[in-house]
Structure formats: structure tokens, C-alpha cells
Amino acid sequence: MTAVYMNGGGLVNPHYARWDRRDSVESGCQTESSKEGEEGQPRQLTPFEKLTQDMSQDEKVVREITLGKRIGFYRIRGEIGSGNFSQVKLGIHSLTKEKVAIKILDKTKLDQKTQRLLSREISSMEKLHHPNIIRLYEVVETLSKLHLVMEYAGGGELFGKISTEGKLSEPESKLIFSQIVSAVKHMHENQIIHRDLKAENVFYTSNTCVKVGDFGFSTVSKKGEMLNTFCGSPPYAAPELFRDEHYIGIYVDIWALGVLLYFMVTGTMPFRAETVAKLKKSILEGTYSVPPHVSEPCHRLIRGVLQQIPTERYGIDCIMNDEWMQGVPYPTPLEPFQLDPKHLSETSTLKEEENEVKSTLEHLGITEEHIRNNQGRDARSSITGVYRIILHRVQRKKALESVPVMMLPDPKERDLKKGSRVYRGIRHTSKFCSIL
């Protein structure tokens, strides 16, 4: 079956960045022997020229490509995770040395349903501009595999932290939860429903900063639009997913936020069972208990979100203005930015950060001519990948992605408060099926 993927949200014939010798020719790169200065003297290759040349002429690099240890401009390291239809590996971008997460999918296993999910995943990530949402840098295709190159969050999953260290303190929970809620608000304002919010899909980039990732089950849904597919992890599933033929997406995401908050402040799940059938019964009954160490304001917020009737659940704004969340700063969305570098070659009036990005690209050897030749390739281009990585780096440096700061209690004091309560549950695997 021929894979078809997103271009502006629709399904079209695939056109992914597949590196071959044409890339260096189209980008204006020549072999080293033909690189001469104005007086006919050999000159040093730019980093971009050197890399593109090595990918076709350097024996070691060619061998890495052949063995699957390199794709495009990325050297592939060890596995750092796995998704519903994929594995995730650490990658190093050869030009910028940026660490990235590379989601690898086997093209032979991409049926029509999986193709639609992948298309939505790419589309969703490219529509969102928020400091607490994982970014997509590039999409690379080889003969047998597809690679989604994304921002790397080196601090691990929220699930892993709580599973090994125990529940978070309430001040820490507020800080982390505020970032997740702000990210979800941004999604919903852009008509995107995540449908798989859980601790396994929240990633630390520092001790106090997290990002929401894995948009593999996301979809676009207008306000009030009814959906009819079950997506996500059963312990986080809202009751209407088990009960009704249709559901409204934002309410499902909000329910998952309630489960997530409960997990953060207690170190365990509100609804637990040995089988999915028993779990379904527990969720439909809506019976759960909140440990006495949880403050009353936090308890009320959890209760307000985990309402059986979707329309009676707290909305995002209500959550953000809740008593328990008072005094917690919410990150704000970034100003929309260009996902393609073409504007750098089309206008002479650039913002400060755009000039810095352009200057860095030129230092690497990526000129306006390369950028003009790159038009129309979207994320499926090594040049676009370099541009997005550098843009993100510049934005981080300018504190557009600020890291929250708060005073946390002494670790020993936290351990005493937690006692021996450490969540030893297994990772929650997301499911996909149609509700009949």
C-alpha cells in the first residue's frame, strides 16, 4: 500500500526528505575538488557542504547510513522509548549537535488507519506554538521507514519520576500541572484534541519544566463536534468513552487532566482494576477515594474535574482560576512563527531573532539560494530541519521558553512526607478501537 500523508492537513502522496546526491546539487553544493575561490585557489568547505559531501563520499558515513545508524543529518543512538506503533531513539544533529528524539515507524506496518493518525500527529504539532508542547523539527523517509524528528526532553517522563520517587508535593504538582493545563488550553483554542493525555506523555526538560508530547491520537475537532473513536489509555478514559456512542473531545481531555492531577498528588491512580472490564465498571461508577494528606482545595479541584456528566466538569478556565491554583503563573503561548525558512530570503525586514537565525544558517553554509531551492518541501527537508532547530535554540536563549523557578522542600523532608508510597504500577499502554 502506498503511504499518504499530510500536507496542510489533507492526505496527499508522500513527499518526505529522502537524502540523496540530488540534495547537494539542488542546494548548490559541489564536490570538494571543484570548490575554488575567486582566484582559483581551493577553499575550505562550509559545514553544510562538508556534511552533504560526506554522506555520499565518506566511507564511514556511508556505512552508518547503510546500517541505519544515520538518517539524513542525524546520527542515531540508543532507544529511549516506544510508542503505539513505533520506537523512539536518541539522535544527534550533525550540523548543530542538537540532541533530538526520533520516532521511527516501519512503513510496511502503516495501514490506512495508522496513516491517518500519523498525518494528524504531524499536522497537530505544526499548528501549535507553545513552550510546553514538544516541537516537530523534521520528517525523514527512507525506503523502509519514516522518522519524525522531534525536540528531545532529557529529563524523562512524569510517569517515571513518580513511579520511582513517589508522589509530588502539592507546590511541585501545581507548578507542573499549570504547564500541562496551559498547553491543553492552547490545543483546545486551536481546535486540537490530544486524546492521550497521561503521565507517560508528559516529559521533563528540567527539574521544573515539562512538555506534553505524543500527538499520535490527536485530532482536529470544532467546538461541540462529536467524535466516535476510543483513543488513549483505559485508566485515563472518561466514562462517556465506555458508555456513549459519541463524545465531545475537550471533555475527554479534561477528565484525563483530573486523573493526571490525582496521580501527581497521590502517587497512584483513582481508578484501578486487574482487568479492563473491571476498570470500566469502576470508572462508570465513579467511585474513588482521595487520601487524607491531600489538601481540601486540591480535593475539591479533583472532584470538580472528575464529574461523570461531561458538561458538569470544570472547564479549562475554571481549572486555571481554581482556589488551589491561585498564585501559580501560567506559561503563555509563543507568538506564531514561520515553520519554513523561505521568509528569510524573501524580505529584508526581519525581526532580531530571525536575523540571528539567518546569520547562524549562513555560518553553517546555508545560503539564501539554498533556502529558495528548499521552498515547498515543508518539514520534509534537511534545511527546514536545521532552520527549526536553530530557531528553537534562539528562542530558548532569549527566554521565550522560560524555565519556571520555585522553592521546593528539602528532598529528605519530601521523602519523609511521602513515606513508602511509591507507585509500582506498570506503564499504561494506549489503545485504539472504534466504539460500536
From Swiss-Prot:
- Reaction equation(s) it catalyzes: L-seryl-[protein] + ATP = O-phospho-L-seryl-[protein] + ADP + H(+); L-threonyl-[protein] + ATP = O-phospho-L-threonyl-[protein] + ADP + H(+)
Q: Which residues form the active site?
A: 196 (proton acceptor)
Activity regulation (record text): Activated by phosphorylation at Thr-229, probably by autophosphorylation.
Q: Which PROSITE patterns match?
A: PROTEIN_KINASE_ATP, PROTEIN_KINASE_DOM, PROTEIN_KINASE_ST
- The EC number(s) attached to this protein equal 2.7.11.1
Q: Which GO terms describe its biological process?
A: intracellular signal transduction; protein phosphorylation
Question: Any keyword Ribosomal protein?
Answer: no
State one Pfam family annotation.
Pkinase
- Name the UniProt key words of this record, in alphabetical order: ATP-binding, Kinase, Magnesium, Metal-binding, Nucleotide-binding, Phosphoprotein, Serine/threonine-protein kinase, Transferase
InterPro entries associated with the record: Kinase-like_dom_sf, NIM1K_STKc, Prot_kinase_dom, Protein_kinase_ATP_BS, Ser/Thr_kinase_AS
Q: Disordered: where is this region?
A: 23-55
Mutation: residue 229 to E; reported impact is: Constitutively active
Q: Which cofactor does it need?
A: Mg(2+)
Positions of the Protein kinase domain: 74-325
Q: Which GO terms describe its molecular function?
A: ATP binding; magnesium ion binding; protein serine kinase activity; protein serine/threonine kinase activity
Q: Where does ATP bind?
A: 80-88, 103
Q: What is the effect of changing residue 333 to S?
A: In a lung neuroendocrine carcinoma sample; somatic mutation
Q: Which residues carry this modification: Phosphothreonine?
A: 229
Going by the record, the broad EC class of this enzyme is transferase
In the record, the note on similarity to other proteins reads: Belongs to the protein kinase superfamily. CAMK Ser/Thr protein kinase family.
What is the official name of this protein in its record?
Serine/threonine-protein kinase NIM1
Instruction: Give the organism, scientific name.
Output: Homo sapiens (Human)
Q: What is the lineage of its organism?
A: Eukaryota, Metazoa, Chordata, Craniata, Vertebrata
